[in-house]
Amino acid sequence: MILEGENIVINTGGRPVIPNIKGIENNKNIFLSEDIMNLEKLPKTLTIIGGGYIGLEFATIYSSFGSDVTIIQNEEEFLPREDEDIVNAIRKTLGEKGIKIITGAKITEIESSTVIYNIGEGERKLESDIILLATGRRPNTDNLCVENAGISLNERGGIKTDDHLRTDAENIWAAGDVCGKLQFTYISLDDSRIILDDMNGNRGRTINNRGAFSYSVFIQPTFSRVGMNEKEAMMNNVKYRVVKLPVMAIPKAKVLRKTEGMLKALIKEDGTILGAELFCEESHEMINFMKLAIDNNIKADVIKNFIFTHPTMSESLNDLFSM
């Protein structure tokens, strides 16, 4: 079949990364994020290889169903991109739900549904009913033969694009996960806006003026973040002060009986908000307000005195920015 068009958009998405571990191939006890929800029987025990956001979300899901869940990862540091206090809070909450986390594990082999790994000099075994591979995702560029159109790939194996998502070939754009960049549905949606504007001659919108990047990890409670955290601020020599609020202090959290977590924000001396980290119920809604504030340079004092409805989780931002 041959398809032709005046303009072409490549949006073939991504797929799970399969690590090179002996015993994975043709193992009926190993699942991916794309098929684990099709199980007809709930596993009593589940091992998740990979401690990233996908792994955490599935750990939370299956733990809430009643499975005994263990996360095992090669990296020594758990959630290395996040601030230590946030990581400690998340790890504590996961632990209280019975989710176990093993870091620094060098997995050598999988036998049926048993993970064989080394920590230090000792070999250990982790047995479970099934195993989920959650070791990241990669762009779907195999077999596209994009080189035939003069299109290049980037260092992550995604399609190389400019700020308007144009590829090396005229009138061909790429959007979403296939670009090998931020892999979120809403980023792919915004990619489509950039491309449509570009096709129509409006080149004002680019991938560089989306504003502060926000995301949510749907564990319980949800962890959401936008803008800089402390690690990034220190790395970039940005001066800041930190404000924090325990979720226990939020009236709506008490109504919901969900008082785990903390709220945190970074503020410059002039009141500019650098970033926010919200580990609480409904943070996936609250973070959008924070992105709007950061993108429009709304200062901390404005949010401090903003009139929120009551009782809501959002009104806690009054208290957070009063600290």
Regions found by a protein language model. Name each.
Residues 218-229, 234-323:
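Flexible, glycine-rich terminal cap/loop adjacent to redox cofactors
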Residues 14-16, 136-139, 247:
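Short glycine-rich anion-binding loops that position phosphate/pyrophosphate groups of nucleotides
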Residues 16, 157-171, 252-264, 268:
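FAD-binding beta-loop-beta segment adjacent to the flavin cofactor pocket
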Residues 15-17, 152-154, 202-214, 238-243:
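A short alpha-helix-loop-beta-strand transition element characteristic
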Residues 26-42, 125-202:
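FAD-site-proximal beta/loop scaffold in flavoenzymes
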Residues 3-13, 48-49, 69, 126-136, ...:
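Short hydrophobic core segments
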Residues 12-72, 101, 147-149, 153-168:
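Glycine-rich dinucleotide-binding loop and its adjacent helix/turn
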Residues 37-38, 43-47, 53-117, 122-123, ...:
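Rossmann-like dinucleotide-binding cores of NAD(P)H-dependent redox enzymes
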